[in-house]
């Protein structure tokens, strides 16, 4: 099947509108591009308390996959990495490639919270945890909006405008269902080509954590490195769109050149691929 669609999946506390600058750039490359809200992220859909499980949480994307004429590329940002792993397992024939944008890429059977909570070396997101608090008996997470300047610095250091991005790009409370759900990937899903887009200056998911996840994943991962913090769709939409479209044009080629990564692997050239077999 031919790749016809690219689906951009947001992370925690975000909505699909965060990709507004990227969507038209990918459309100009000839793709149908979607940036849906996951369940609980659209005003009036029941919010975080309505989320039952990952099937329910990712249903808006599954519906797009079902309607697509060909195969789709799935991109997940941050916590959205857990969503694309789930979708790849349950819809492998509809997915041509997976892109993890400074995202959760846990090994099968491992939950995202394993890399969020402090623990072993190259784990933990202390800057993010300092700004997030559990609510509703642990069923939701809220950002501390009384510290807007710090929120912007940590989560949106790439935003080029004054103040905060538009409010419609965010939600108040995030469901914790994705954090506690193990990656279900096995079999066919593990054969789908994967690209990890590193954000070298990210303090939400530090580069050491990004590379530890790549190292522990049971299979090769192609890599592109960007000199960005946690939200490169704000600071460098053109370069991000180029990396996405290049992968979408030939995901099988990336699978052939992908290799294992690790916390000590050198980054690629500024914005370039670092996925060749001769890398240490």
UniProtKB/Swiss-Prot annotation:
The keyword Hydrolase applies. One of its GO terms (molecular function) is methyl salicylate esterase activity. Optimum pH is 7.5. The active site is at residues 202, 230. Its EC number is 3.1.1.88. It holds the Pfam family Abhydrolase_6. Gene3D superfamilies: alpha/beta hydrolase. Residues 254-280 are annotated as: Disordered. Keywords: Hydrolase, Serine esterase. InterPro entries: AB_hydrolase_1, AB_hydrolase_fold, MES/HNL. The keyword Hydrolase applies. One of its GO terms (biological process) is salicylic acid metabolic process. It catalyses: (-)-trans-permethrin + H2O = (3-phenoxyphenyl)methanol + (1S,3R)-3-(2,2-dichlorovinyl)-2,2-dimethylcyclopropanecarboxylate + H(+). Belongs to the AB hydrolase superfamily. Monomer. Catalyzes the hydrolysis of pyrethroids pesticides. Catalyzes the hydrolysis of cypermethrin to equimolar amounts of cyano-3-phenoxybenzyl alcohol and 2,2-dimethyl-3-(2,2-dichlorovinyl)-cyclopropanecarboxylic acid. Hydrolyzes cis-permethrin at approximately equal rate to trans-permethrin. This is Pyrethroid hydrolase. It comes from Sphingobium wenxiniae (strain DSM 21828 / CGMCC 1.7748 / JZ-1).
């Amino acid at each position: 099947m031919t790749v016809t669609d690219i689906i951009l999946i947001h992370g925690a506390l975000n909505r699909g509108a965060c990709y507004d600058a990227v969507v038209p750039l990918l459309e100009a490359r000839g793709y149908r591009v979607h940036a849906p809200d996951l369940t609980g992220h659209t005003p009036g859909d029941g919010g975080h308390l309505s989320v039952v499980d990952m099937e329910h949480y990712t249903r808006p994307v599954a519906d797009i996959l079902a309607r697509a004429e060909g195969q789709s590329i799935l991109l997940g940002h941050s916590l959205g990495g857990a969503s694309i792993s789930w979708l790849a397992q349950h819809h492998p024939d509809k997915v041509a490639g997976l892109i993890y944008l400074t995202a959760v890429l846990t090994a099968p059977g491992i939950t995202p919270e394993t890399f969020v909570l402090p623990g072993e070396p190259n784990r933990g997101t202390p800057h993010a945890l300092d700004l997030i608090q559990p609510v509703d008996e642990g069923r939701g997470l809220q950002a501390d909006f009384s510290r807007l300047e710090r929120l912007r610095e940590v989560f949106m250091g790439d935003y080029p405008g004054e103040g905060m991005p538009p409010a419609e790009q965010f939600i108040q409370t995030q469901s914790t269902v994705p954090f506690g759900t193990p990656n279900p990937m096995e079999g066919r899903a593990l054969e789908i080509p994967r690209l990890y887009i590193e954000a070298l200056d990210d303090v939400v998911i530090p580069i050491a954590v990004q590379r530890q996840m790549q190292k522990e994943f049971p299979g090769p991962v192609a890599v592109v490195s960007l000199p960005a913090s946690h939200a490169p769709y704000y600071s460098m939409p053109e370069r991000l769109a180029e990396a996405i479209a290049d992968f979408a044009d030939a995901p099988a080629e990336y699978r052939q050149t992908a290799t294992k990564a690790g916390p000590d692997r050198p980054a690629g050239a500024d914005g370039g691929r670092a996925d060749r077999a001769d890398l240490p």
